[in-house]
A protein has these predicted regions:
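Secretory-pathway glycoprotein ectodomains that are cysteine- and/or Ser/Thr/Pro-rich
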Residues: 1-176
Length: 176
């Protein structure tokens, strides 16, 4: 057996110049985020209220992933959360939102009131939650005070010192 991806016994980090907590191992790959609704099939116009919605996110390189739901109740952080507390995800790995393969997914995503709903996922090279305004560090899966829509969400992230280091994707659907 060989250990793959573990820190060598000699101490240092396995990737040169990698800072602790950084998403390394896929340098040189342009980061993209793919986000899609899995159960909105051809011919369907949208979801009925209370119908479950399932999404999949995928990043092209190792990244810290933060996903937010925007609906009639406001904007809330879906990932990371109490069940999936780590923001670091591997490149090209399907992240299910919610994790419908888990017996305890942490939450169920249901269409709310008629209108447009969306999930926005942001991928970064390093953890950023501690750098965001205090309201973002509150309990996940609860409306974030003062953040009314996706524009407010993105504006808060633009305030980071190196705001050009995040990539985003959004998936929208209509609640009928």
């Amino acid at each position: 057996l060989a250990r793959v991806g573990w820190v060598p016994s000699g101490g240092g980090l396995p990737v040169a110049n990698l800072q602790p907590g950084a998403a390394g191992g896929s340098e040189g790959v342009r980061r993209t985020v793919e986000l899609r609704v899995e159960n909105l099939f051809a011919g369907r116009a949208g979801f009925a209220p209370a119908e479950q919605v399932f999404l999949t996110a995928r990043v092209s390189r190792n990244s810290h992933l933060y996903c937010y739901l925007a609906n009639a109740s406001g904007v809330m952080r879906l990932l990371p959360n109490e069940t999936n507390s780590q923001s670091l995800v591997a490149a090209n790995h399907a992240i299910r939102i919610p994790d419908w393969m888990s017996p305890t997914p942490g939450f169920i995503l249901q269409a709310d009131r008629p209108g447009i709903e969306s999930v926005t996922c942001l991928a970064t090279d390093r953890p950023i939650l501690a750098e965001l305004p205090e309201v973002f560090r509150g309990e996940p899966i609860r409306p974030i005070p003062g953040i009314r829509n996706v524009a407010d969400l993105l504006q808060a992230h633009d305030g980071l010192a190196d705001s050009n280091t995040f990539t985003q994707a959004r998936a929208e659907w209509r609640v009928l």
